[in-house]
């Protein structure tokens, strides 16, 4: 089932971030940093955060943001990340999460979605081939 995020999901999202997210290249985070970068970020909204729940377990999530204060935020929504557990990481589940997020953007009057550096939710990732060197604004969707 795809549904909106609730604060009770925060621990599950952090776990997904530090397991599946780090395999995608995102930098590992403790709870305080995760909150600052995502769940308590000023542009975070439960309206634009969706979870994939199966038999009571959160197996994935997608997050995005929008707003008139963001460059072109009056017409587009920004996709921050899509992270799925290894057991749920399928094209179908990715499509379900993205569809929920894009539908929420449409309901808010946005005409298209973007994965770009204009997104104010800047998620740190590890530069490939380095011993943990971070960059602060990763596109949040795998390219393969």
PLM regions and their residue ranges:
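Conserved acetyl-CoA binding element of GNAT-fold acetyltransferases
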Residues: 72-87, 118
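Short loop/turn motifs at secondary-structure junctions and domain boundaries
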Residues: 40-44
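Acyl-donor-binding surface of acyltransferase catalytic domains
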Residues: 90-144
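Short amphipathic alpha-helix that is part of the acyltransferase structural core
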Residues: 1-37, 49-53, 78, 144
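Conserved beta-strand in the GNAT
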Residues: 51, 57-67, 78
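Catalytic micro-motifs at enzyme active sites that drive phosphoryl/nucleotidyl and oxygen chemistry
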Residues: 39, 66-70, 102
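Feature marks short, surface-exposed loop/turn motifs that line or immediately flank catalytic pockets
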Residues: 20-21, 68, 119-123
């Amino acid at each position: 089932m795809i549904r909106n995020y609730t604060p009770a999901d925060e621990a599950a999202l952090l776990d997904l971030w530090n397991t599946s997210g780090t395999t995608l290249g995102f930098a590992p985070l403790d709870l305080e940093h995760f909150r600052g970068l995502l769940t308590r970020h000023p542009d975070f909204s439960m309206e634009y955060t969706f979870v994939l729940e199966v038999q009571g377990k959160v197996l994935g999530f997608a997050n995005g943001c929008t707003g008139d204060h963001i460059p072109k935020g009056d017409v587009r929504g920004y996709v921050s990340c899509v992270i799925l557990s290894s057991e749920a990481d399928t094209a179908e589940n990715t499509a379900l999460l993205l569809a929920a997020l894009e539908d929420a953007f449409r309901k808010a009057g946005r005409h298209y979605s973007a994965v770009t550096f204009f997104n104010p939710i800047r998620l740190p990732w590890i530069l490939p081939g380095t011993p943990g060197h971070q960059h602060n604004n990763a596109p949040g969707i795998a390219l393969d």
